[in-house]
Design a protein with these regions (language model features):
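C-terminal terminal-subdomain/extension
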Residues: 60-122
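Pocket-edge structural micro-motifs
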Residues: 11, 38, 59, 74-75
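Membrane-targeting and insertion segments and their boundary/processing signals
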Residues: 10, 44-47, 74-77
């Protein structure tokens, strides 16, 4: 498992028993932890606020995904590496690697601008 891999991880539910396998994009792998972003195919019914945090994977088919999908950049998830069970799906294309980097910078910039605006008026 390495950065920009797409894998399926079993994620436990927080409020009930059980869980399900979810596709994630690997951000970073260290000796002890794996950092990842969730991948979703659910986009249309999300709020504008949530949608602005979703990067649309351009080369989703070559990445091994079955349908158009988005990377949820709103939260990063950390998993202990020891005993982590995963299934390889594919790898993010160079095009998507570059575009997601630009998208992330633009997202951070808009968050900073929003925070600056809030500070001015508060």
């Amino acid at each position: 498992m390495r950065t920009n891999d797409l894998v399926s991880l079993y994620v436990s539910f927080v409020e009930t028993n059980g869980g399900k396998s979810r596709p994630v994009l690997i951000r970073r792998v260290s000796e002890q932890t794996v950092e990842a972003f969730k991948i979703t195919s659910q986009y249309e019914k999300k709020s504008a606020y949530i949608k602005q945090q979703y990067y649309p994977i351009q080369d989703w088919q070559s990445a091994g995904l079955k349908k158009p999908s988005w990377v949820d950049l709103g939260n990063i998830y950390r998993f202990p590496k020891a005993g982590l069970n995963f299934k390889e799906i594919g790898h993010l294309s160079k095009l998507d690697q570059n575009k997601i980097s630009d998208f992330t910078l633009a997202l951070k910039s808009s968050i900073v601008k929003s925070s600056a605006t809030l500070r001015i008026y508060s």
